[in-house]
Amino acid sequence: SRRPLPARVPAGENPLAIAGPSCAFSSMDEPTKTARKPAWLRARLPGGPGYVATRKLVEDNRLHTVCQSAQCPNLGECWSRGTATLMILGNICTRSCNFCAIATGRPTELDLGEPARVAEAVATMNLRHCVITSVARDELADGGASVWAATIRAIRHRNPGTAIEVLTPDFKGNLAHVDVVLDARPDIYNHNLETVERLQKPVRVQARYDRSRSVLRHAKSRGFATKTGIMLGVGEEPAEVERTLRDIAADRTDILTIGQYLQPSPKHLPVSRWATPEEFTHWKQLGLALGIGVVESGPLVRSSYHADEQSARYAGEGRGNASVLATA
């Protein structure tokens, strides 16, 4: 059963009593003085037979990955392990979020063969846990929900033992479109808040904090395991991060990821600061104390980073009712 949100922890107080001089976020309000990344942000460079095989698989099946389109720093590690987060509905987004490297513009026509190719790629990679995401397709009547459903069903048919995690857009808050995705029965429903409420407009101008929360609450109300993620380094304050974690816990979200924002190009939102590994540990401990089941928090953490391990920990706590999760 879910750990209840501790009533004994008043808002604004740290339930772990770890705040103080040793854990003070002294750089929280200070802008980044140098473009040089700290040592803890060094990621594995692409290379090796696993990386080559994954790249060939993606290219041969004419697939898109968020690893490439979003310039994920973990691409080298994940592809070397033979895993990739596949991105459906093309690689051009109808939104223009200021943190995201994915191209914005007029999307191409729908590729009706994409669901089958995605399912085959999951089989070829022999994934026990796959993560599927997409661009936003606001120009479509259903926001792409029907393609989402077709993809989930194709993966399930071809790979009945694979846990399916979906990372979806907000479908402009249309819960009927969210239901189309949920009716296809993914194992984990992920939708990212991305940042604190105050910074929604400068970070992702076409989204809303309350709308994203409503999507997550709706999925939870239907009995699905839910997941969300936020970034540090876009101008947030410590109290705002705490408030966001409290909101996530109040929405009974099961899994939370917290990572460092990295500026994709000079045209994107600048990095306000480099959060330290100690700060990521602080927020992980706070999230767990508030009752969030699984918290993955670290400078290089992204939504799909070690997602299989997150779902295994979730299943290990006896949460959820999807037997597939136990094999992830």
Task: Give the role of each language-model region.
Residues S1-N14:
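Extreme N-terminal basic, low-complexity initiation segments
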Residues S96, L140, L199, P266, ...:
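Glycine/Thr-rich phosphate-binding loops of Rossmann-like dinucleotide-binding domains
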Residues P31-L41, E77-E114:
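Canonical Radical SAM [4Fe-4S] cluster-binding loop centered on the CxxxCxxC motif
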Residues E13-T85, E120, N126, A150-T162, ...:
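Auxiliary Fe-S-binding modules of radical SAM enzymes
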Residues N91, P169-K172, G235, L300:
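Short, surface-exposed acidic/glycine-rich loop or hinge patches that mediate macromolecular interfaces
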Residues P73, T94, E197:
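Nucleotide phosphate-binding site architecture
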Residues Q68, I88-L89, T133, L167, ...:
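A secondary-structure boundary/capping signal
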Residues A101-V118, V122-H177, V181-R217, K227-M231, ...:
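Core AdoMet radical
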